[in-house]
């Protein structure tokens, strides 16, 4: 998700180190210590303006959430939500999703959310897709054995690619929704993108895939 540059975003986020983690590599293997409890850790890669991860954290205080995004201005919008209504179980990281092993220890994360990731439709950009095998290999390292990825998109091509990528990697496809908003799925929290696309009548796809413990 791209947004207009927000003047002063860096200075704004620096004022709230209790929410936006500075030097996240020093918390590798110690995220539960950072949260002050032993609750499960769920992360969202590409958390955008933060609606999904914020509402999840609000609905599930028994789980620790971490929203990850590289874009400074957009992460500052997610921070707005925490400043207005603080939650003790949500942290924000401005880091690259390709380098997660620098910030999380092996088997430290319980679940990964991928919501409306960039589809990178051109074949030459396949390696940039967050469901490409190299990203899955990184995800598998930081996830606990039998850890899961929950993936949502409006892009049918990316969805079909991701189902294939999960299967080729050896993951178990637990559940699939080909039209999420017209299904019996309960508790769905919409992202900003999801609300925009669904209001146009676009179908939303969802899958839950699990790594197989080795």
Curated annotation (Swiss-Prot):
GO MF, one example: tRNA (guanine(46)-N7)-methyltransferase activity
Catalyzed reactions per annotation: guanosine(46) in tRNA + S-adenosyl-L-methionine = N(7)-methylguanosine(46) in tRNA + S-adenosyl-L-homocysteine
A Pfam family annotated for this UniProt entry: Methyltransf_4
Annotated region (Interaction with RNA), positions in chain: 124-129
Positions of S-adenosyl-L-methionine binding: 44, 69, 96, 118
UniProt-listed InterPro entries: SAM-dependent_MTases_sf, tRNA_(Gua-N-7)_MeTrfase_Trmb, tRNA_methyltr_TrmB_bact
SUPFAM superfamilies the record matches: S-adenosyl-L-methionine-dependent methyltransferases (SSF53335)
Pathways per UniProt: tRNA modification; N(7)-methylguanine-tRNA biosynthesis
Enzyme class: transferase
UniProt-listed Enzyme Commission number(s): 2.1.1.33
Keywords carried by this UniProt record: Methyltransferase, S-adenosyl-L-methionine, Transferase, tRNA processing
PROSITE patterns referenced in this protein's UniProt entry, alphabetically: SAM_MT_TRMB
Sequence positions that bind substrate: 122, 154, 191-194
Active-site residues, Swiss-Prot/TrEMBL: 118
GO CC terms of this entry: tRNA methyltransferase complex
Family designation: Belongs to the class I-like SAM-binding methyltransferase superfamily. TrmB family.
Entry-linked HAMAP family: tRNA_methyltr_TrmB
Reported function: Catalyzes the formation of N(7)-methylguanine at position 46 (m7G46) in tRNA.
Protein name: tRNA (guanine-N(7)-)-methyltransferase
């Amino acid at each position: 998700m791209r947004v207009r540059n927000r003047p002063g975003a860096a200075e704004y986020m620096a004022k709230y180190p209790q929410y936006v983690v500075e030097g996240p590599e020093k918390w590798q293997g110690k995220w539960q210590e950072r949260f002050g409890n032993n609750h499960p850790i769920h992360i969202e890669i590409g958390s955008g303006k933060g609606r999904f991860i914020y509402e999840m954290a609000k609905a599930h205080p028994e789980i620790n959430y971490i929203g990850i995004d590289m874009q400074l201005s957009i992460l500052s919008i997610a921070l707005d939500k925490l400043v207005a209504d603080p939650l003790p179980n949500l942290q924000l990281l401005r880091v690259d999703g390709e380098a997660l092993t620098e910030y999380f220890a092996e088997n430290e994360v319980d679940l990964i959310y991928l919501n409306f990731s960039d589809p990178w439709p051109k074949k030459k950009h396949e390696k940039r897709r967050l469901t490409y095998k190299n990203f899955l290999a990184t995800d598998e390292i930081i996830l606990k054995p039998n850890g899961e990825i929950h993936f949502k998109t409006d892009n049918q091509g990316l969805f079909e690619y991701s189902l294939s990528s999960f299967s080729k990697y050896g993951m178990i496809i637990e559940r699939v929704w080909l039209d999420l908003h017209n299904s019996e799925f309960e508790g769905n929290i919409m992202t900003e993108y999801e609300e925009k696309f669904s209001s146009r009548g676009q179908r939303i796809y969802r899958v839950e895939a699990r790594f197989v413990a080795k």
